[in-house]
């Protein structure tokens, strides 16, 4: 068992040496860059939020890194934010306590952060409510500007994709067509009653 483990480790080391020697782009970025990207993403969310309170990240994960050159890269992150007790004027939400309660606003967010030499150059972010029970109208109230700005920059987001539910529009149209083609049951019932009265009057 130990011999097999040693062979696996040796093969792994040799493989990494091969990729580095063959000119494969290996970017050893500082872990602090990830924290900078997350902080910039949360700041972007708070700048576009219409809530009177600041949001703070609860969980985060790095989904993809696109290396543009030796100094510039683009990070794609996914994270969740929750409303804190600090007002917008507080500035930094990192030390703010989370609000308590059943209906505290929590959102799932995606961001694309462009960094150069360890410094944040540009940030794009988009959020949706983590709870499916929230309505689209309430989402627009707090994150109204973010959805519009995201759609405008869709073609520029190097590897950042947002999966919109394509079936919603078709579903709404089908309901509308059904409503136009078939009047409600009580109206059909009234029409039948009217015809019955007219026919009985001529008899």
Curated annotation (Swiss-Prot):
In its keyword annotation, does this UniProt entry include Secreted?
yes
What keywords were assigned to this record?
Disulfide bond, Phosphoprotein, Secreted, Signal
**Origin: domain of life:** Eukaryota
Main localisation, per the record?
secreted
Cystine pairs:
86-96, 109-127
Q: Which residues cross the membrane?
A: none
The entry's localization annotation reads:
Secreted
Post-translational events = Multiply phosphorylated at serine residues.
GO-annotated biological processes: bone remodeling; protein-containing complex assembly
Q: Name one GO cellular component term.
A: protein-containing complex
Phosphoserine PTM positions = 90, 137-138, 174
Q: Which residues form the signal peptide?
A: 1-23
State the protein's purpose: Could coordinate an aspect of bone turnover.
- Family statement: Belongs to the SPP2 family.
- Could you tell me what this protein is called? Secreted phosphoprotein 24
> What is the organism field in this record?
Rattus norvegicus (Rat)
Q: Which gene encodes it?
A: Spp2
């Amino acid at each position: 068992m130990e011999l097999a483990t040693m062979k696996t480790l040796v093969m792994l080391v040799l493989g990494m040496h091969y990729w580095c020697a063959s000119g494969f782009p290996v970017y050893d970025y500082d872990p602090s860059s990830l924290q900078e990207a997350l902080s910039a993403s949360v700041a972007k969310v708070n700048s576009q939020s219409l809530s009177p309170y600041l949001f703070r990240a609860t969980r985060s994960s790095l989904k993809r890194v696109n290396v543009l050159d030796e100094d510039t890269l683009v990070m794609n992150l996914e994270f969740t934010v929750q409303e804190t007790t600090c007002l917008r004027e507080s500035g930094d939400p990192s030390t703010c306590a989370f609000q308590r309660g059943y209906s505290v606003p929590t959102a799932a967010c995606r961001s694309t952060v462009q960094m150069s030499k360890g410094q944040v150059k540009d940030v794009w972010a988009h959020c949706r409510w983590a709870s499916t029970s929230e309505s689209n109208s309430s989402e627009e109230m707090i994150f109204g500007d973010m959805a519009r700005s995201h759609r405008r920059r869709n073609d520029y987001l190097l590897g950042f994709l947002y999966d919109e539910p394509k079936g919603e529009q078709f579903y709404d149209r089908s309901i509308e067509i059904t409503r136009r083609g078939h009047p409600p049951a009580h109206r059909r019932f009234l029409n039948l009653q009217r015809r019955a009265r007219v026919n009985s009057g001529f008899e």
